[in-house]
Structures are given as structure tokens and as C-alpha cells.
Amino acid sequence: MTSLHGAESGYRTYETPVVILHTGYDLPGQQKKEKAKRNIRLLEQELKQLGWDENAGAKDGVAKAETAGTDAKACGSEQIPYLLYQLGKSYYMMGEYGAACDWFAQGLSFDLNPALEYVIDMVETYGYALINSGQEQTALFFENIYDEFGKSADFQFLMGLIYMKNARFTEAVREFKKAAGHAECRAQGVNSYRADYNIGVIYECLGKKEEALAYYRKCGGYAPAEERIRELGWG
């Protein structure tokens, strides 16, 4: 783990067996949206105080991301890319995936440390936002950052989805299998039943029913997999 700004000196870290669950967005749909709207207002105010040029904001899309990043750097604030990340997350929580993509693009226009947790999450959530907004072809540019981010189960699972959405099934299966080979992950199931389920779906679509069945059965009672087994008369 590193600090927000990537400084690693001055303190020591170690792994503990403690799991902390954040339930801040574990709310009914409308309450979640209201909380996200409140956060957006606060984040926009903070950006304005830091000298962020609102005319280069997310509403102008990816095309202005590089210019926006340059303007932010001129303000001399290392907080700005993190605030842009939080804005993207807030729009993502509201289901406004296109707007989330624009904010993430601006946040990632900075020269950031790829080891930072928030940078890793920004990259991965950006990928899901692209998929959820119908921009799966655009998401193929994640191939270009694979060397920096592609060592985790979470990123490999995301790449599997990107390939799957683009009907590149061989690459998708490869990435899901790589994800399933990890002992640890951040998002639940991406290194186990969710990866196996998607491999099963691909094999079923390709007419490889025996292979599909084998992967569905590896999902350990995962409801969508059990449903596929029943629907196909294999249960």
C-alpha cells in the first residue's frame, strides 16, 4: 500500500488478517443517487477552490482530457487527479457511465503512479464504465496498458470481459483462466466462480456444451451457473 501521492518512505507496512467492509454506498437506489449527487457538488466545489478550469470539465469529453490535465498541473495541486477519480466514481454509482468515462479520462491524463490503489481502481472502473456505456470497442485500448496493470486477477478479469464483448473469445477465455489462477482479488469472485461462469458462457455459445458444463459446475452453486445447468437440462 502507498500513500495518495505515492510516497513510500518514512513508515513501514505489513499485511494483517483484518477485512474492512465499506458500506457507504450500500443504500437503496434513490438514496445512493442522492448521496452521489451530494458528493458531486462537494467535489466540484473543491476543484473550483483548487483552480480547476471548469470549462475543460467532463462534459466536453475525452478530447479535452489532456488539456484539462495540463491546466490542473499548472495549479500545482496533486489532489486534482484524485478528485477527478472521485467524480468519476460518483457518476458511476449513479449509473451515468458516459459521464464517468469523461471524468476518468481526465484523471488518467496525469502522469500517475500505477501502484497507487486509487489509480488502479480508476483504471478498472473506467474499463467497466466503457463496457456499460456501450464503448467496448474503445475499451480495447486497455491492451496498451496491460504491462502496467495486467498482473492482477481484477484487471485480467476485466480484459476478459472486454474481449468477450468484442467477440474475441479465445483471448477472453485466456484472460479468465489467468484471473482464476490467482489466490487473491479485490472484487469478489473474479478469481473463481465469476471467471469460470464466463468461460462456461463462451463455451456454450461456441457449441462446446461439455466444456461449458464443466465450467458451470466449477462455480460452486453460483446462481446464474445453476440456472444455465437447469435450462440446458443438465441438472
Name what the model sees in each region.
Residues 1-53, 75-95, 99:
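Catalytic-site signature of metal-activated, phosphate-bearing donor transferases
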Residues 82, 117-121, 154, 194, ...:
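Start-of-helix register in tetratricopeptide repeats
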Residues 97, 135-136, 169, 209:
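TPR-repeat structural position
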Residues 100, 138-139, 172, 212:
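Single-residue signature of alpha-solenoid repeat helices
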Residues 104, 142-143, 176, 216:
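Hydrophobic/aromatic packing residues within the alpha-helices of TPR/SEL1-like helical repeat arrays
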